[in-house]
């Protein structure tokens, strides 16, 4: 019995999954996408930055720009023997599940974007505005030479970006049930508290940084940073790593190091969080220093052309009302939003992302393709 033919989206998704593009590698994924886009009239601009492959593609000459953004890199597989199916050999099982690293995050979305645009440009060759793609192989890694760097080049040349759909797996149970219309900011820090090393039997000759820091860390953890707002939950503070000691049981350590992170709403600022943290540490009389690292500022896309167009497309294709959300971690949307762009994240169900045996319902990618296509119709059809 002959296996049923795959849809164009599933064919492309399988081709992309079969390429072992563990971050920051691309393994030819972008070339495959670029060839397809060039065939329907896109101008392709590869951007090789350090060890990262990126490309910018655009079709049209004037009017508002709808950009599709995403990444071809995937996270490492973990132990291969733990996978039921080789991670870079796409397979659709008897239950209709598409297996492979990147099926959900986010090669499935990339395939849906390309096929949706191929259909739209064939049906509407003289569409309004412009369609663009911003694709990187540096999202799952440090993310220094990917979308962030490409956005800076676009900013320097004055490239407008009105609307952007990022293909992150936003859905929770059914495709389109949730879209991300913003993300919290992420501010990390490494706190060093200095004491005086000594013998545990002679504490009066030492200063134990663990004892000194504990009340301050407890106060930081209990602090009410803000109330959040209608779009964001309250800002959170979490300690992720705590290190002190030499490994010996009879030595008071000389220093303590605590790694922490703020996920912050638009009700707080970087400067405000830093100042309040410093005030608490100073109140406890600590000898301290912090190495701060800002991963991204919070951004929010309020109801408007893009969010309305996406919600209308989801309703038209699935009959469902979508729920906008700002929950979850950071994404490359934080870089694109700095251009003043309306940004929405819309992709497959995220239940197995970054896991062994990553998989999604294969038919969901055809639904996603239809949603992307209908969004193009809603925003750019003449």
UniProtKB/Swiss-Prot annotation:
Give any Pfam family that matches: M20_dimer
InterPro entries annotated for this entry? ArgE/DapE_CS, Bact_exopeptidase_dim_dom, DapE_proteobac, Peptidase_M20, Peptidase_M20_dimer, Peptidase_M20A
Gene3D superfamilies xref list: Zn peptidases
Supply the enzyme class, top level. Answer: hydrolase
Which amino acid positions bind Zn(2+) 2, per UniProt? 105, 140, 354
User: Where along this sequence does the record place binding of Zn(2+) 1?
Assistant: 71, 105, 168
**Pathway given in the UniProt record:** Amino-acid biosynthesis; L-lysine biosynthesis via DAP pathway; LL-2,6-diaminopimelate from (S)-tetrahydrodipicolinate (succinylase route): step 3/3
EC number(s) stated in the UniProt entry for this protein = 3.5.1.18
Q: Which SUPFAM superfamilies match?
A: Bacterial exopeptidase dimerisation domain, Zn-dependent exopeptidases
Cofactor binding description: Binds 2 Zn(2+) or Co(2+) ions per subunit.
Q: Name one GO biological process term.
A: lysine biosynthetic process via diaminopimelate
The residues annotated as the active site are 73, 139
Which first-to-last residue range defines the signal peptide?
none
Q: Where are the transmembrane segments?
A: none
Q: Which cofactor does it need?
A: Zn(2+); Co(2+)
Task: Return the NCBIfam families for the record.
Answer: dapE_proteo, PRK13009.1
Family, as annotated:
Belongs to the peptidase M20A family. DapE subfamily.
How does this chain assemble? Homodimer.
Its job: Catalyzes the hydrolysis of N-succinyl-L,L-diaminopimelic acid (SDAP), forming succinate and LL-2,6-diaminopimelate (DAP), an intermediate involved in the bacterial biosynthesis of lysine and meso-diaminopimelic acid, an essential component of bacterial cell walls.
State the name under which the record lists this protein. Succinyl-diaminopimelate desuccinylase
- Source organism (scientific name): Stutzerimonas stutzeri (strain A1501) (Pseudomonas stutzeri)
This protein's encoding gene: dapE
């Amino acid at each position: 019995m002959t296996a049923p033919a795959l849809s164009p989206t599933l064919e492309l998704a399988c081709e992309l999954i079969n390429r072992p593009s563990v971050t920051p590698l691309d393994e030819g994924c972008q070339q495959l996408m670029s060839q397809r886009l060039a065939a329907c009239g896109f101008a392709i601009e590869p951007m090789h930055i350090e060890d990262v492959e990126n490309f910018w593609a655009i079709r049209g000459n004037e009017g508002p720009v709808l950009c599709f953004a995403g990444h071809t890199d995937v996270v490492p597989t973990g132990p291969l023997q733990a996978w039921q199916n080789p991670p870079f050999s796409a397979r659709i099982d008897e239950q209709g599940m598409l297996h492979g690293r990147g099926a959900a995050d986010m090669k499935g979305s990339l395939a849906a974007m390309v096929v949706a645009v191929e259909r739209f440009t064939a049906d509407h060759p003289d569409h309004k505005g412009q369609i663009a793609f911003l694709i990187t192989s540096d999202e799952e890694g440090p993310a220094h030479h990917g979308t962030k760097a490409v956005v800076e080049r676009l900013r320097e040349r004055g490239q407008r970006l009105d609307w952007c759909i990022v293909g992150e797996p936003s859905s929770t149970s059914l495709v389109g049930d949730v879209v991300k219309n913003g993300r919290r900011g992420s501010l990390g820090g490494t706190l060093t508290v200095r004491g005086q090393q000594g013998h545990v039997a002679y504490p009066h000759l030492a200063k134990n940084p663990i004892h000194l820091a504990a009340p301050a860390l407890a106060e930081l953890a209990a602090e009410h940073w803000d109330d959040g707002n209608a779009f964001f939950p309250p800002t959170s503070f979490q300690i992720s790593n705590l290190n002190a000691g030499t490994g010996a049981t009879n030595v008071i350590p000389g220093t303590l190091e605590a790694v922490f992170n703020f996920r912050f709403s638009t009700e707080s600022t970087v400067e405000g969080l830093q100042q309040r943290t410093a005030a608490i540490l100073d109140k406890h009389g600590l000898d301290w220093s912090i190495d701060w690292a800002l991963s991204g500022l919070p951004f929010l896309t309020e109801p408007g052309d893009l969010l309305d167009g996406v919600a209308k497309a989801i309703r038209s294709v699935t009959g469902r009302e979508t729920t906008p959300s700002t929950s979850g971690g950071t994404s490359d949307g934080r870089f694109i939003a700095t251009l003043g762009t309306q940004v929405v994240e819309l992709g497959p169900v995220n239940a197995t992302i970054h896991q062994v045996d990553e998989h999604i319902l294969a038919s969901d990618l055809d639904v996603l393709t239809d949603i992307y296509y209908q969004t193009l119709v809603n925003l750019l059809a003449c």
